[in-house]
């Protein structure tokens, strides 16, 4: 199976690798995995007071397509509103990276990780209001 140039670029030069402080109230963390292949993806977002994502980081243990999907979405979501980021679909990720059908689950993981990070952020925000 041949990877596209974009997958190879994001795999060899991943963007935004690392972690944010998950204790911060404006940081949301999404941790997702694919039991079928063993890929695990952690994606974190940092959100400003205006609900714009100011930073995004990821750590992914998996194949080149999983790493490339993570790297790409961290670039895509920076500067977007939380609501706009939530609308990113795995099909858009797969199309951008020219993922073969056997690797579509990697783009789905990235979509799920975004949604999980946003849900975590929103939960923290609600808890902050209650305290």
Curated annotation (Swiss-Prot):
Q: Which InterPro entries match?
A: ISCU, NIF_FeS_clus_asmbl_NifU_N
- Can you name one GO molecular function term for this protein? iron ion binding
* Gene3D superfamilies listed in its UniProt record: 3.90.1010.10
**What Pfam families does the entry give?**
NifU_N
Which segment of the chain is annotated as a signal peptide?
A: none
User: For this UniProt entry, what's an example GO CC term?
Assistant: cytoplasm
* GO biological process assignments: iron-sulfur cluster assembly
Q: What the protein does? A: A scaffold on which IscS assembles Fe-S clusters. Subsequently gives the nascent cluster to other proteins. It is likely that Fe-S cluster coordination is flexible as the role of this complex is to build and then hand off Fe-S clusters.
The record's comment on protein family reads: Belongs to the NifU family.
Q: What assembly does the database describe for this protein?
A: Forms a heterotetramer with IscS; each subunit of the IscS dimer contacts an IscU monomer.
Q: This chain belongs to which protein, by name?
A: Iron-sulfur cluster assembly scaffold protein IscU
Which species is this UniProt entry from?
Rickettsia prowazekii (strain Madrid E)
